[in-house]
Design a protein with these regions (language model features):
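Alpha-helical transmembrane segments of multipass membrane proteins
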Residues: 19-27, 56-64, 104, 121, ...
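Transmembrane helix-loop-helix hairpins at the membrane interface
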Residues: 82-197
Length: 197
């Protein structure tokens, strides 16, 4: 199914990731003090970062599975019709989630956060998600609530970056997006009209 003009395409997501990586490398090279890129590889040992990110992903996936398989909980999930039109077939949730995790964490956490701080970085991160908020709901209240949640996620990911490291922030961010998109795909499949046999 071709994407509508309002829904993000896979190509657009990958290009955005590449743009964010290029901006992160440029901003770090131009604006960070020497030695450059130290924030990119500092933090806790990689094994600890991988373990914590993996545990987070397992807990998140378990929670999503419970919600999707308990009818009383699943009925509480409300997905706007505009989000139901996003093509999430095949490996798209994985590609989009990994691209967002890598590109956004390199730009917003590794590059910008050391320059502007945790809170301003989280606000910039939320502002970068304004288009997604517009896809989600026509209501200004719901859009604002979504952006506040994204800002809170930006603070949480910023703390992960500061206390654990970039690898953990990338993997936690990617797991949120991948699991969220796969859950959206599941909800969309259940909501799709059944074809007559």
């Amino acid at each position: 199914m071709p994407p509508s003009p309002r829904t993000p395409s896979l190509k657009g997501q990958v290009l955005t990731c590449l743009l964010f990586v290029a901006l992160a490398v440029s901003a770090t090279a131009l604006l960070h003090p020497s030695p450059k890129f130290t924030q990119w590889h500092s933090g806790q040992p990689i094994s600890l970062q991988l373990s914590i990110a993996g545990a987070f992903a397992v807990l998140l996936a378990t929670g999503a599975a419970i919600v999707l398989h308990v009818p009383a909980l699943c009925r509480l999930v409300r997905v706007p019709a505009t989000l139901m039109t996003i093509d999430l077939s095949g490996t798209r949730p994985w590609i989009v989630g990994l691209c967002a995790g890598i590109g956004e964490e390199l730009l917003f956490r590794a590059s910008l956060q050391p320059l502007v701080g945790l809170w301003v970085g989280a606000i910039i991160f939320a502002a970068a998600h304004a288009r997604t908020a517009m896809l989600g709901s026509p209501s200004i209240v719901k859009r604002s609530a979504y952006l506040l949640n994204v800002a809170a996620a930006g603070v949480a990911l910023g703390l992960v970056f500061e206390h654990l490291g970039l690898v953990a922030a990338i993997l936690i961010h990617a797991s949120i997006d991948v699991i969220g998109l796969m859950a959206l795909r599941s909800v969309a499949a259940r909501s799709a009209p059944k074809s007559a046999a």
